[in-house]
């Protein structure tokens, strides 16, 4: 890759042009989609738009020290990016794995610790991403948040892993 624009252009080459769900948060959320102070609302907006719009907004803020947060979560590849799977796919069906491929696109976003129902294969193609895995018996020590609302459809840990409050979360 010569630049961040290269993978954006590559994705747009497969774009079906359908409206997609995407999320936006102002610079004040510092890339961390989460709850408000009393856990009654989320600190970001879910909207509908085009992939070109989202990628354009990401590109507009590539060099901002505190950019707004933009992401597209679990976009089903075959419907939104026809041909992408054939050009980049994992041969899952050859191994009797029935899993529709999805893609996650965003800028500097920190996803809170959560449990994904599907079995995932994670691959960071552009940029950097850290995945921290915990055994199931540690769930209580991760302080799960409320069932509704949720930042991504599943319950997330309320602990800020980058700045944990050990008084509020002593078992973390």
Where are these regions (language model features)?
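N-terminal accessory scaffold of Fe(II)-dependent oxygenases
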Residues: 1-172
């Amino acid at each position: 890759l010569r630049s961040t624009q290269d993978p954006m252009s590559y994705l747009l080459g497969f774009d079906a042009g359908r409206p997609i769900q995407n999320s936006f948060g102002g610079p004040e959320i510092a890339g961390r989609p989460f709850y408000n102070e009393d856990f009654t609302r989320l600190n970001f907006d879910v909207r509908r738009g085009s992939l070109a719009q989202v990628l354009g907004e990401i590109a507009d803020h590539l060099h901002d020290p505190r950019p707004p947060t933009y992401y597209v979560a679990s976009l089903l590849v075959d419907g939104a990016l026809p041909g992408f799977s054939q050009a980049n796919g994992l041969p899952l069906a050859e191994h009797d794995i029935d899993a529709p491929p999805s893609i996650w696109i965003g800028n500097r976003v920190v996803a809170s610790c959560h449990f994904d129902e599907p079995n995932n294969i994670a691959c960071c193609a552009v940029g950097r991403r850290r995945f921290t895995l915990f055994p199931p018996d540690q769930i209580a020590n991760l302080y799960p948040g409320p069932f509704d609302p949720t930042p991504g459809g599943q319950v997330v840990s309320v602990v800020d892993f980058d700045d944990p409050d050990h008084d509020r979360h002593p078992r973390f």
